[in-house]
Amino acid sequence: MTQAAYDVIVSFSDTLAQHADFAAIKCCYEEAKIGDWLARLLTYLRAQPSAWVHDGLMVFDTSYELSLYITTPTEARALNLDYRGKDYATNILSYPADLPAEVADELPLVPLGELVICHAVVDEQAAEQGKSLAAHITHLIIHGMLHLLGFDHELGQAEQDEMERIEIAVLADLGVANPYELS
């Protein structure tokens, strides 16, 4: 069996790229680091026979590509309104690739989908919640990856509990405190 590979592509909105603090913002989204997070998440899921995955969507020894797009509140709000009917800038949106298995089998890297992150909202939430920006970004990206893999906490309490359990375990492996515990 060949070693699975995880390719992460991070892009930034043109408006955000012109921000005075762009260099600091860009450092928050290192492709190699996020690829490691994906590898650790998939390793964890592989070892969890109880973890459910939407319609057997993912074979965890496959090589994957993950795209992240970091944007502004204006664009995040428009996307949230267009695709979810919610008129506010949200922290993260997940757009799964949902390729048919016969197509995915032909590709060297299976696209998981795209995570759209509004950095300003994430930064504001981290400050409000008394969390480090790095810890909050890590949590949200792990959360978004789970959505791309077919997990959905909006289906009910059992699904929410399962997602949170996985997030807490993977974040602990990454040295990040439980984001659901009040500080």
Model regions: which residues?
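An acidic/histidine-cluster motif and surrounding catalytic segment
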Residues: 1-138, 149-183
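Short active-site segment of divalent metal-dependent hydrolases/proteases
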Residues: 142, 146-147
